Amino acid sequence: MKYPISVQDFEKLITGKYVYVDKTDLVYELAQLNVCFLSRPRRFGKSLLISTLEAYFTGKKDLFKGLKIDELEKDWTEYPVFRIDFAGGNYAKPEELENKINNLLGNWERKYGSDELCQTISDRFKHVLMASEEQTGHKAVVLIDEYDKPMLDVIGTEQEQKNRETLKGFYGTFKEADKH
């Protein structure tokens, strides 16, 4: 019996034949919501849940064979998924947060196209979300892991205000682009 100690990747967990407590019926319920915010203590499986949602929304039906969600989901639609993981950076460094977001945006723009008129992070992200819907015919799914790390790294420092403004613009995109 293999226990998934520190395994945060759903595909690795399933294909590696690790012990898995099937709660995919709850994942199915969660996926029916338009917007969902989950806040849990450290080491509570948030990253694995994000990975599970990513596999679900990218239509990886084979990973869910024999699990509860396999009986519930009929369509297995593949959505454009934008996974953002802020866990890896040191956001106390100036420009680290903007560099991280710009790198993510650059990858997505290569996939879905860019618009030279979109110069700000929020405009670029909004354009990518709209372009992904136009190209796939499906609304985008945005999954964010460690959403608060860029702020936790800089509490009480000069960088705090800069990171707050960057995140405000970035997260503000969701309200503007809700229909995409």
Question: Each PLM stretch: what is its role?
Answer:
Residues 1-180:
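Phosphate-binding site recognition
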